[in-house]
Amino acid sequence: MAASTGKLRTLFSAHSSLSARPSSALPALRLTILRSYATTTPPDSSISDPSNSSTTVKRPPTAFKDKLNAGPAFSDFVSGKKDEPLDPAEAYALKTALVGPAGRKKEITRLPSWLKTPIPDSSNYKRIKNDLRGLNLHTVCEEARCPNISDCWGGSSKSAATATIMLMGDTCTRGCRFCSVKTSNKPPPLDPHEPENTAEALSRWGLGYVVLTSVDRDDLADGGARHFAETVLKIKQKAPNILVECLTGDYAGDLEMVALVANSGLDVYAHNVETVEALTPFVRDRRATFQQSLRVLKAAKATKPELITKTSLMLGLGETEAQLWDTLRALRAIDVDVVTFGQYMRPTKRHMAVHEYVRPDVFDMWKERALEMGFLYCASGPLVRSSYKAGEAFIENVLKKKRGKNVGSASGKGTTSENVEKLVAGEAVR
């Protein structure tokens, strides 16, 4: 900038000295004023000199333009040619997708069309949700992000609608790699009003079937078994016609607590093995073992032989066909009555990845195999969960086969409800 200003001053000084001479002695003079620039880069000669039109600067092609040029032409869409089968590379490209910020993208498996569900919207769904909020109750339907929430809460009829209440709070003391429920070593204390509030809500809804489940509470001496049993008693008092299924934890292997819940007046005792034995250490919390789950189901049936026992397995975790056969044989050996199969769906990217999206026809195949092995009922499908349409399944299938048997009959010392009430209160049964 200073150099350019100096040149201007020199030129103007020369012009002043020449203008002082007589006009007859002055030669023709053309004054050129130099323009100074803030940067040191000189202007493009092709721009400053219009005569130099042969040299032009081309703009670099954009990535978007390249993709358009490399893509299909308009004729490809209107040619009317019959679609040809995709080659393996093209099929894989449609099955997967890259997600994440630039430079850190990860390949994920796309969700198949058969796993996509509509947004929940029904009057029964809204009413149940509002009542839950008013009574400070939790459901595993919401906490575990179940895709069937509108289907189950709506139901094909009011009496067949199913709700799954999650007792003892929304924070679990265990951390299974497939589950989206919150975890903590010190969850909040139990709500003493929860059994009464749960019974009150269910009596309002007029449901025909309810599933009670809970988080694991290893911080409690009894694992929450007495709280569970008290809730069942309250429900049966306020709504004696409602069918109750209890989906319990393993109570750290304490079979006395299993017997306490089994004698509480419930209709179905459920405990999930979740996966095959070989994958259990990688899927569930290390405190939950496959053999311990079998002992829980066996103890429930031994406590009350007429009780219906139930379990559930997730597919798509990497299990083999031979491992599934072994699992079903182990379940039938301890007289489990009902089994369900469903697709594992990753709740968040922090949870274990899906190994495989199992096709619907494979689920149908395992349903047929389970029924042939002697299970009373099997619900099997990509969107099936442990309590998926449990009311309809139980009412339409299992109860018909068990009709004529008094499920709630008294046995042993005193009636079932009397014994459980004493145990819940901490009294000895005589």
Curated annotation (Swiss-Prot):
Range annotated as the organelle transit peptide: 1-37
GO cellular component, one term: mitochondrion
EC number: 2.8.1.8
Positions contributing to [4Fe-4S] cluster 1 binding: 141, 146, 152, 387
Cofactor binding note of this UniProt entry: Binds 2 [4Fe-4S] clusters per subunit. One cluster is coordinated with 3 cysteines and an exchangeable S-adenosyl-L-methionine.
Catalysed reaction, written as an equation: [[Fe-S] cluster scaffold protein carrying a second [4Fe-4S](2+) cluster] + N(6)-octanoyl-L-lysyl-[protein] + 2 oxidized [2Fe-2S]-[ferredoxin] + 2 S-adenosyl-L-methionine + 4 H(+) = [[Fe-S] cluster scaffold protein] + N(6)-[(R)-dihydrolipoyl]-L-lysyl-[protein] + 4 Fe(3+) + 2 hydrogen sulfide + 2 5'-deoxyadenosine + 2 L-methionine + 2 reduced [2Fe-2S]-[ferredoxin]
Pfam family, one: LIAS_N
Family: Belongs to the radical SAM superfamily. Lipoyl synthase family.
Protein name, UniProt field: Lipoyl synthase, mitochondrial
Protein species of origin: Ajellomyces dermatitidis (strain ER-3 / ATCC MYA-2586) (Blastomyces dermatitidis)
